[in-house]
Each structure stands twice: as structure tokens, then as C-alpha cells.
Amino acid sequence: MMGEAVVFSGMKAPKYFFTNVKRHGALLAKGRMLGIQFDTLFTDELYFKISRHAIATATRIRSIFEKHGITIAYDSPTNQQFVVLSPTLYEALSQKVAFEIWERKSEHEIICRFVTSWATKEEELDELDRILQAYA
């Protein structure tokens, strides 16, 4: 999804909100296209239906890391999971698994982000589990 939404409850946007957004260059000229995208995704809970698999696989990734005693950096209910890896485990995993560094917390701790999607396969999660088992 390409876009962000600002929600005001009770239809009460702050005074001059849209003027300030425009003035600071934060309003896209083609905003209608993004609006159509948001409208479509939130009609009949389509967004939640298509993201269900990604969130379920991310939850399983979290469980796999917890099973192997790896610290979860942030509580994330989304398709992204953040874990704390040692430099040694980071190096070993980065040879076999796609993920990215989110933050170098210290010389001994690296927070890494693992992201799932509609295309994430259970076999890939099983492989992650096997890889971590080998380093336990």
C-alpha cells in the first residue's frame, strides 16, 4: 500500500489542517488515486482478509524465535517482527534468510526486522526453525 491516512473522530479536523498539509508539501497531487485504494481496501474488510496470512505467519515467526530463546525487541501485531540477535547469529542467519537490520542497539545486540507477506510459505518458516535449531 502506498499512502498514509489521518483519522479524525467526529469529523472534526483541526482548523486549517488541509491548508497546513498542502503548505508543507505533504499532500499529493494525485491523492484521489490513493483515496480509491483506501476505499477499496477497507470495503468489506478486504485489507484484513488479504493480510490475515501475513499476520499469521509473522506470529509463527515470533513463536519460532521465542522457542529458541531469542528476545523479541518490540511487541508487533503486524506482519513485521523485530528480534534481538547477537552479531554471530546475525551473520549466520544472513547467509540463509532474507531480513534487515533495524537498529544496532550495541556491539552485542542487533535488532532485526523480519517481514512476511501473502506469499510467505510454511516451508520457509520450517526452514527458519531448522536453521535456528542448528545454532542452539
Regions found by a protein language model. Give the residues of each.
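Conserved C-terminal alpha-helix-loop-beta "cap" of PLP-dependent enzymes
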Residues: 59, 64-134
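A short, terminal or domain-edge coil/loop segment
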Residues: 16-28, 122-136
